[in-house]
């Protein structure tokens, strides 16, 4: 075999002869051979559920077919697309061609599946999508930096990769780099240890578009924040585009230096909220079409009604239903979907935690009156429980900052931010307070 693609293609043909069409299409049709490391073939699956199923159910069959194709015993390792960055870093570097390139340019690490074409637009992400497209069409001219925030699995990373792909498609010479703040931190630490700080700086200050994910993780890391501050200034000063994502807006990231916070606010800040029902159905339809699946509308509606948290869980539920159908050899309908998802959908949704409920529990714990939360008193015996209640309101409810402030005597949203940051910092060092907070959370969840 000349390459691993041919090897895997030949192996898949043999596997297809051994399985039913639904089983093959569900589990193996969308797999891809990514690398061959010594005696281990790295195979990517479309999602975590498929990866786990392949490991548990098909490892022996795949190994047997690989033996027939290659004449050698090969091990297998199953990964998902998010793991490809790690694999790329482990591959031996090819012999470089003669070039004026210094070798300092990092790889872009863009996921080919995350483009604007595959992004489903809805009410919760429409503005973020429009801003991302504007930045992609005119880097460093529309909004710089672009700061996208929102919960896990809502599409922040998808939009960042989409920007990267668009820029590279329209300007192949552009140096586009995507990485997480954790990777930035780890590379920076390694550069210091290896006495290669200048190499690190050249690497990230000589690019055209920087996409950095989960920036909240550099909070509290003074040296990393210092380095990123200068990287930001160098790129921005040269009119290079910077796109940043986080799980919260800059003003709510605790222990983030003010100078970074202010720079993150120079451009445009946009959020992504959980998809509404119509968007969830559209996401499921697009996923089904991409996977070549024919799913009844009633099943799409059922899944969309049951899974309303984020896109990853939504798509995972769809794959789970398809997998279950293949396993039990039954057609997909709403009843089968309910059986397939019964382990991940609670029989009854947990009761919503409200700010008044938080105030009642905190008042009882700290022996204050409910009216003290709205009072102007600033004594420690009142102010501290009030800050605890504000912190819990921010952590456990979907209420906006102004709404929380309103529930505490009409206080300004900045007071809520201050309370949340103060308690967050205290929790890092005060184990007794951490224990108290956890007990309060458990009480609230059991109401």
Swiss-Prot record:
Region feature (Domain IV, binds dsDNA): 326-447
Primary location: cytoplasm
Keywords in alphabetical order: ATP-binding, Cytoplasm, DNA replication, DNA-binding, Lipid-binding, Nucleotide-binding
Disulphide linkage map: none
GO terms for biological process, alphabetical: DNA replication initiation; regulation of DNA replication
Residue ranges of the region described as Domain I, interacts with DnaA modulators: 1-74
Top-level division of the source organism's lineage: Bacteria
Positions of region (Domain III, AAA+ region): 109-325
Compartments where located: Cytoplasm
Region (Domain II), start-end ranges: 74-108
Cellular component annotations (GO), alphabetically ordered: cytoplasm; plasma membrane
Compositional bias of kind Polar residues: 97-107
Claim: DNA-binding is one of the keywords in the record: yes
Binding-site positions, ATP: 153, 155-157
InterPro entries in UniProt: AAA+_ATPase, Chromosome_initiator_DnaA, Chromosome_initiator_DnaA-like, Chromosome_initiator_DnaA_CS, DnaA_C, DnaA_dom, DnaA_N_dom, DnaA_N_sf
SMART domains per record: AAA, Bac_DnaA_C
Gene Ontology molecular function: any one: ATP binding
Region (Disordered): 85-107
NCBIfam families: DnaA, PRK14086.1
Similarity section: Belongs to the DnaA family.
Domain notes: Domain I is involved in oligomerization and binding regulators, domain II is flexibile and of varying length in different bacteria, domain III forms the AAA+ region, while domain IV binds dsDNA.
Subunit structure: Oligomerizes as a right-handed, spiral filament on DNA at oriC.
Described function: Plays an essential role in the initiation and regulation of chromosomal replication. ATP-DnaA binds to the origin of replication (oriC) to initiate formation of the DNA replication initiation complex once per cell cycle. Binds the DnaA box (a 9 base pair repeat at the origin) and separates the double-stranded (ds)DNA. Forms a right-handed helical filament on oriC DNA; dsDNA binds to the exterior of the filament while single-stranded (ss)DNA is stabiized in the filament's interior.
Name of the protein in question: Chromosomal replication initiator protein DnaA
Organism of provenance: Oceanobacillus iheyensis (strain DSM 14371 / CIP 107618 / JCM 11309 / KCTC 3954 / HTE831)
Gene giving rise to this polypeptide: dnaA
């Amino acid at each position: 075999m000349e390459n691993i693609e041919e090897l895997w293609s030949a192996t898949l043909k043999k596997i297809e002869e051994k399985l039913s069409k639904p089983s093959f299409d569900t589990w193996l049709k969308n797999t891809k051979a990514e690398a061959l490391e010594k005696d281990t073939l790295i195979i990517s699956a479309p999602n975590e559920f498929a990866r786990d199923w392949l490991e548990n159910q098909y490892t022996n069959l795949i190994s047997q077919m690989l033996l027939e194709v290659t004449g050698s015993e090969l091990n297998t390792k199953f990964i998902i697309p998010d793991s490809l960055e790690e694999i790329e870093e482990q591959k031996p570097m090819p012999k470089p061609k003669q070039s004026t390139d210094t070798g300092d340019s990092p790889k872009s690490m863009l996921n080919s599946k995350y483009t604007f074409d595959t992004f489903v637009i809805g009410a919760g992400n429409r503005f973020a999508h429009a801003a991302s497209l504007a930045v992609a069409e005119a880097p460093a001219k529309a909004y710089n930096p672009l700061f996208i925030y929102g919960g896990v699995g809502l599409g922040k990373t998808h939009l960042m990769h989409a920007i990267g792909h668009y820029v590279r498609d329209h300007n192949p010479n552009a140096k586009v780099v995507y990485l997480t703040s954790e990777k930035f931190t780890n590379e920076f630490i390694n550069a210091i240890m290896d006495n290669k700080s200048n190499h690190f700086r050249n690497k990230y200050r000589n690019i055209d578009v920087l996409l950095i994910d989960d920036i909240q993780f550099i909070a509290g890391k003074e040296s990393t924040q210092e380095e990123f501050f200068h990287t930001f200034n160098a790129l921005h000063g040269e009119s290079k585009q910077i796109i940043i994502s986080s799980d919260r807006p800059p003003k709510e990231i605790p222990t983030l230096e003010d100078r970074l916070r202010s720079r993150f606010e120079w451009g445009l800040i946009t959020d992504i909220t959980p998809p509404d029902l119509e968007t969830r159905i559209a996401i499921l339809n697009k996923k089904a079409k991409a996977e070549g699946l024919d799913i009844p509308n009633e099943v799409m509606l059922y899944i969309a009604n049951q899974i309303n948290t984020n896109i990853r869980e939504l798509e995972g539920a769809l794959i789970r239903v398809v997998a279950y159908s293949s396993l039990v050899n039954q057609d997909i309908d709403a009843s089968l979907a309910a059986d397939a998802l019964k382990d991940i959908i609670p029989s009854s949704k947990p009761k919503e935690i409200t700010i008044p409920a938080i105030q009642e529990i905190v008042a009882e714990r700290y022996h204050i009156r409910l009216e003290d939360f709205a009072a102007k008193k600033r004594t420690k015996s009142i102010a501290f429980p009030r800050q605890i209640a504000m912190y819990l309101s921010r952590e456990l409810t979907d209420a906006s900052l102004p709404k929380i402030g309103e529930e505490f005597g009409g206080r300004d949203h900045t007071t809520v931010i201050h309370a949340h940051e103060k308690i967050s910092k205290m929790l890092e060092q005060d184990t007794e307070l951490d224990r108290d907070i956890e007990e309060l959370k458990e009480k609230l969840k059991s109401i």
